[in-house]
Amino acid sequence: MMGLYRCMKELTERFPEILFEGCSAGGNRFDLGILSYFPQIWASDDTDALCRAEIQNGYSYGYPMSVVSAHVSSCPNHQTLRVTPLETRFHVAAFGLCGYECNLGDMKEEERAAVKAQIALYKEWRDVLQWGSFFLGRSVYDGKGEGSRLVELSG
């Protein structure tokens, strides 16, 4: 690990204008030390919104939302082939560093308009979503459906 840290230190010092992102390399393979060099982490290559809700729930116990990248991906999802509404995919991704990894050219005009509105909404609430206090509600694992979250801006 120390060799990796030396490489990260060298990269970030040599190229301070580049935003580097750590990668979990399949999940659960990053540690707090990586955040000393890379300010954000890609938590998992599984971008299916329902799977990702569980992944992000787990990370929320130890990491702030401001460090874990989360993306709205194509539908059907390329890992699970699950078809999930665009709104659901956005709602999950918004509880992280929200991004999109889908071909907008494949979307209908109304979906592209929805993406534009989602990005505007995320920008409006970004301070709360990334830097607010995050409280866990009902667990996503209790068998009663989706978990609940409350976020409030600190200070």
Residue ranges and their predicted role:
Residues 2-106:
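Glycan-recognition surfaces
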Residues 101-155:
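Glycan-recognition and catalytic regions of carbohydrate-active enzymes
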